[in-house]
Amino acid sequence: MFQGSSALTLDAKGRISIPTRHRDALMDRAEGRLTLTRHPDGCLLVYPRPEWEEKRAQIAAFPMSARALQRLLLGNAQDVDIDGSGRVLIAPELRNASGMTRDVMLLGMGAHFELWDAASLARREAEDLAQGMPDVLNQFSF
């Protein structure tokens, strides 16, 4: 399971270096094979390929009323591999769609990651905190 955040930098070719603490697990779990796609919140989702295969089947089975979401998730999905230096290429289409510039944040979200433009994530977190805690946390103790 993946957790925690990592501040990363896109290189001139649009690649990020996967943090070592995640790289080994991704190599063991998915042989370094990942799938990236867009998320409605404006970030990119990064899945180890085996987990993505399960999600892809679930998304493909959505009813016609969810066609726009299918188009966003499946139509933008791109398979990538971690290279020998531990880097992953983020396609220009995905970088542009998510507003990624140079500084990005990789967030471990359990079985997958979210990849955000750093400034966009900071704005989003500030907006989310300003709205207060969701009701689901009323029964949760930290």
UniProtKB/Swiss-Prot annotation:
InterPro entries xrefs: MraZ (IPR003444), MraZ_C (IPR035644), MraZ_dom (IPR020603), MraZ_N (IPR035642), MraZ_sf (IPR038619), SpoVT-AbrB_dom (IPR007159), SpoVT-AbrB_sf (IPR037914)
Matching Gene3D superfamilies: Transcriptional regulator MraZ domain (3.40.1550.20)
Segments forming domain SpoVT-AbrB: 5-51, 77-120
GO terms for MF: DNA-binding transcription factor activity; transcription cis-regulatory region binding
Cellular location(s): Cytoplasm, Nucleoid
CDD domains for the chain: MraZ_C, MraZ_N
Keyword Transcription regulation carried by entry: yes
GO terms, biological process: negative regulation of DNA-templated transcription initiation
Principal location: cytoplasm
Alphabetically ordered keywords of this record: Cytoplasm, DNA-binding, Repeat, Transcription, Transcription regulation
Signal sequence extent: none
PROSITE patterns reported for this sequence: SPOVT_ABRB
GO CC terms, sorted: cytoplasm; nucleoid
Cross-referenced NCBIfam families: division/cell wall cluster transcriptional repressor MraZ
Family: Belongs to the MraZ family.
HAMAP family referenced in this protein's UniProt entry, alphabetically: MraZ
Record's subunit section: Forms oligomers.
Protein name per the record: Transcriptional regulator MraZ
Species name: Bordetella pertussis (strain Tohama I / ATCC BAA-589 / NCTC 13251)
Taxonomic lineage: Bacteria, Pseudomonadati, Pseudomonadota, Betaproteobacteria, Burkholderiales
